[in-house]
Amino acid sequence: MINQANNQVNFSEQQFVHHKRFSVIRLTFSVAAIGILFIFLIGFGVQQLLTNTTSLGTLASDIRTLGTIAFVASLVSLILYFVTAFKLRNRNTTLAWFWGLIIADVISYGITLGVLLTLATTQLRELIDFKFSDIVFAFLGAALVYGTVWGLSALPSQQRRYQQTQTLFRIFIWAFFISIIASLLTFVLNFTVFRGGRTNILDLLFPGLSLIVGGIFSLLSVYFVCLQIRNEQDLVKLYESQDPALAKAQMWRSALFFGAWLVSSFMNLVYFILRIILLTRNLSRAF
């Protein structure tokens, strides 16, 4: 009787994982979709808050305050990415770490989106030639790019996919250290040579280089996360035959971590496309 009950429990666990074998992929995209939904909710909330501001001076002050909050949230998110990356394979890790990562991402991108919506729907849009339709086109473009890259990520074989993710991971590690050095150099230049001005070390070397580099790494990040989501699916499938409970736990850790990364890479792609739209408009006006 006891053995029969134990077998039933094991069967229900296996049935859960087998039924959810789409789990990592579908659950990851579900987490990302919910995250983007909350980004929109926060964005519209921030827009309503800023739209009620009576003067441009107060509006600028509020935008700076919200920008500081968004920066702090993005910094917390960056720290949590490193912490949770090392905890991703630890079966004893609580999911609170991964939920915290998603929440920090949603707050950061939600506030940024809210500021953009405010710029596109208030009297400020006349000053910077920025429209609400630009944001819509940026989101549609990012969705199209992401869908295309997701399809391309299915082409490599399993072994080739693992090799590509390892190569991209090394590139991201080096890029992280280079970006830290570039940020420090920019910070020093802004408070010494340029006396409080704002510049970018890449744009000093070659105008527009920061946009090009940002675009390349946005696409690489999208491709990497698409490959890795498929790798996580393979891993959970392996765990399924050995330990269904472990497979279930790993499914949630993977879905939350890479769901957050998917949100981050998607929103970065949106902002990159938005910069392209604005740059193209400014160039067309110049000529």
From Swiss-Prot:
Compartments it resides in: Cell membrane
GO cellular component, as recorded: plasma membrane
Record bears the keyword Cell membrane: yes
Transmembrane segments: 27-47, 66-86, 97-117, 135-155, 171-191, 205-225, 254-274
Keyword Metal-binding: no
Domain of life: Bacteria
Protein name as annotated: Uncharacterized protein MG320 homolog
Organism from which the protein derives: Mycoplasma pneumoniae (strain ATCC 29342 / M129 / Subtype 1) (Mycoplasmoides pneumoniae)
Species lineage: Bacteria, Bacillati, Mycoplasmatota, Mycoplasmoidales, Mycoplasmoidaceae
